[in-house]
C-alpha cells in the first residue's frame, strides 16, 4: 500500500464521514465505508502518537533552556 501523509489520510477520513452523513447508502455499503473509516482513523491516530512522542517543550528555567517531554494523557490510547 502506498504511503500517504497525515493530511491526505485525514481528508479521506473526512470524505468517509461525509458519505455516511449525506449519502443514502445500503446497510452493506455503509458498513464497508465505516470499516474503511476505522482504518483511516487508526492511521491518523498512529501518526499523531508518533508525532506526539517527538514533541518537546522548551521551558526557561533560571536563564537556561531545558527540554521536557510533551505532556499527554496516559488514559488516551
Swiss-Prot record:
The keyword Glycosyltransferase does not apply. NCBIfam families: PRK00977.1-4, xseB. One of its GO terms (cellular component) is cytosol. GO terms for biological process: DNA catabolic process. The keyword Oxidoreductase does not apply. Its EC number is 3.1.11.6. Its main location: cytoplasm. Heterooligomer composed of large and small subunits. Belongs to the XseB family. It holds the Pfam family Exonuc_VII_S. It comes from Alkaliphilus oremlandii (strain OhILAs). It catalyses: Exonucleolytic cleavage in either 5'- to 3'- or 3'- to 5'-direction to yield nucleoside 5'-phosphates. It is an enzyme of class 3 (hydrolase). Bidirectionally degrades single-stranded DNA into large acid-insoluble oligonucleotides, which are then degraded further into small acid-soluble oligonucleotides. This is Exodeoxyribonuclease 7 small subunit. InterPro entries: Exonuc_VII_S, Exonuc_VII_ssu_sf. Keywords: Cytoplasm, Exonuclease, Hydrolase, Nuclease. One of its GO terms (molecular function) is exodeoxyribonuclease VII activity.
Amino acid at each position: 500500500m502506498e504511503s500517504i501523509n497525515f493530511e491526505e489520510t485525514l481528508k479521506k477520513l473526512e470524505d468517509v464521514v461525509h458519505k455516511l452523513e449525506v449519502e443514502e447508502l445500503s446497510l452493506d455499503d455503509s458498513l464497508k465505508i465505516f470499516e474503511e473509516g476505522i482504518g483511516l482513523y487508526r492511521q491518523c491516530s498512529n501518526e499523531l502518537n508518533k508525532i506526539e512522542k517527538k514533541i518537546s517543550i522548551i521551558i526557561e528555567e533560571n536563564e537556561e533552556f531545558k527540554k521536557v517531554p510533551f505532556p499527554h494523557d496516559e488514559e488516551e490510547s
